[in-house]
Regions:
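N-terminal helicase ATP-binding lobe
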Residues: 1-181, 185-286, 290-317, 322-337, ...
């Protein structure tokens, strides 16, 4: 056990010590069954475990077990997303043996349902409204559970009240046993220590993601070309920074859908189907942050997730939507910005931070120049109204500061591969030998045309098998880069070439006929053979 004091945050109250314990136990459920009943009122505990570990499910399950033993116990469960709550409502009802009571609700009604037995289920948006309206019904609950608590910082750049809500939590739930859950608590931990009335106990389980394969790309066009070439039997989930970006990108693909916050209102049946089946209905799904937390996807065809950020916290949360079974793997795509792009991002962040810091110096100038300007919605959504003043959300400033610090770290790094190493470290992965990270290679139209022309030339020709195999492999890698299991000292056999041709979907196939490889152009129905050497 170690006492870990975090950096002071200017202008905030004295922070509580953070007492951190590393847990090596592999059984979260067994540990929670001994921990939760012994928590004291007005205590603060953060449980940290990797995405997909069952941290949320087992915490809630353990607390509800206590409710079943003692009918006087009450619980408030709060999360960052409606999706989390929708999935948890079914689990809560199942454990309380009242799941049939949910049958009378349609999709919208289920979203609006806030009480199941002794458990109140809210998003943090709904909780904030209750606190602001002076609703005191929840102040005497025995357990307060906040899932994905880091979202108060991560969402702060588009939800203006997260800082105010964080300040209110320990006061509003002052008699409760407060349990915070997160796989990525780093953004929120110091801020939570500022507002909590008691020392914070951080119980951290090891988290690593050996089934994830990070793939880096330097240009969006490279990514789009690659996604178009994935096997037809596989699906991709692509996170986008905005609805407009999602619309633009999804228009470039067949069998594509866009999921946004509006989906659950405009198409609640589709939304509920996504949550209940845990599968994607389109080959390519583009999504805003609506499903970047809480949505669990078990779709075996989902093999590719594209992250919209280089922040390790967001990479983990977005890639973590796919729940993997033993033996399954996931390709996780991460942008690799250039120095010029990093400088541009940093410049924008510093400009926004400079504007927000003018609020304390000159309110009237800040309001007239930024808040009332029609094209400055970016500034307005960072601010809230209190006591006759328009104030910036201090967690938004913290979030922007954190982004700026991360970018400065990349810009000023003396050693190469700094972003790649940072991501590998965050995912608990061993660094590849000789820094052999995986990158998407830009394939030019010329290289693709050369490959296609070469294939056309082989139809009707007879050549030595090993020569054909080696040339085919080289041509493919010139266009698309090496595949995961490719080795320089191994040629491709017939089965590999057949699979690659099927994936490319260029109208070629290859078969073995009487010891001869026969390459066919399916569009012209002509054949050629390569004899075995």
């Amino acid at each position: 056990m170690k006492l870990n004091f975090k950096v002071e945050l200017l202008g905030r109250p004295t922070f509580q010590p953070i007492i951190e314990v590393q847990r090596s136990s592999s059984s979260i459920s067994k540990f929670l069954s001994s921990l939760v009943p012994n928590l004291a009122p007005d205590s603060a505990t953060i449980l940290v475990a990797g995405v997909g570990s069952g941290n949320t499910t087992w915490t809630l399950h353990t607390v509800i077990d206590l409710c079943l033993q003692d009918s006087s116990i009450s619980v408030c469960f709060v999360s960052s997303r409606c999706a989390i709550n929708s999935q948890m409502k079914h689990k809560i009802a199942r454990q309380l043996k009242c799941e049939h009571d949910l049958d009378c609700y349609n999709e919208i009604g289920l979203q609006q349902l806030k009480q199941i037995g002794p458990v109140t289920i809210l998003t943090y948006h709904a909780l904030y409204s209750m606190i602001r309206e002076g609703d005191s019904r929840l102040q005497d609950v025995d357990f307060f559970i906040f899932d994905e608590v880091h979202s108060l910082v991560q969402d702060a750049t588009f939800v203006s009240f997260t800082g105010e809500l964080l300040r209110d939590l320990p006061r509003f739930f002052s008699s409760a046993k407060r349990i915070y859950l997160s796989a990525t608590p780093e953004p929120i931990l110091a801020h939570l220590a500022k507002v909590e009335s008691q020392p914070i106990h951080v119980l951290r389980f090891p988290s690593h993601y050996p089934q994830w394969k990070p793939i880096f790309y330097a240009d969006e066009s490279i990514l789009l070309q690659h996604l178009h070439s994935i096997p037809k039997t596989e699906k991709a989930l692509i996170f986008v920074p905005s609805i407009s970006a999602g619309r633009s990108l999804s228009s470039k693909f067949d069998s594509a859908q866009l999921i946004t916050a509006r989906t659950k209102l405009e198409n609640p049946q589709k939304w509920q189907e996504l949550l209940s089946t845990q599968e994607l209905s389109a080959r390519y799904t583009f999504s805003t942050s609506t499903i970047d937390a809480g949505v669990s996807l078990t779709d075996p065809a989902l093999r590719h997730i594209v992250c919209s950020s280089i922040d390790p916290v967001e990479v983990i949360q977005q890639a973590g939507r796919r729940r993997l079974k033993s033996g399954e793997t996931l390709s996780v795509y991460i942008p690799l910005p250039s120095q010029q792009q990093l400088w541009l991002q940093l410049s924008r962040l510093e400009e926004t931070l400079s504007i927000l810091r003018t609020t304390s110096n000159n309110q009237s100038l800040f309001i007239s120049k930024y808040v009332l300007e029609e094209d400055r919605t970016d500034i307005r959504q960072l601010c809230y109204w209190k006591d006759g003043k328009i104030l910036p959300n201090y967690l938004a400033i913290a979030s922007l500061d954190r982004q700026a610090q991360n970018i400065r770290h990349l810009i000023n790094a003396k050693s190469p591969y700094i972003l790649e190493r940072t991501i590998y470290h965050a995912l608990g992965l061993s660094l590849p030998a000789d820094n052999r990270f995986i990158y998407l290679k830009h394939r030019s139209d010329g290289e693709i045309s050369a490959f296609q022309d070469w294939l056309h030339a082989q139809v009707g020709e007879i050549s030595e098998k090993d020569s054909f195999s080696e040339t085919f492999k080289t041509q493919y890698q010139n266009c698309f880069g090496a595949r995961k299991n490719d080795r320089s000292d191994r040629s491709w056999g017939l089965s590999v070439i057949k699979k690659v041709l099927s994936t490319l979907n260029w109208g070629f196939s290859i078969e073995a006929k009487r010891g001869i490889w026969v390459l066919s152009d399916l569009r012209t129905h002509s054949e050629g053979g390569e004899k075995i050497g």
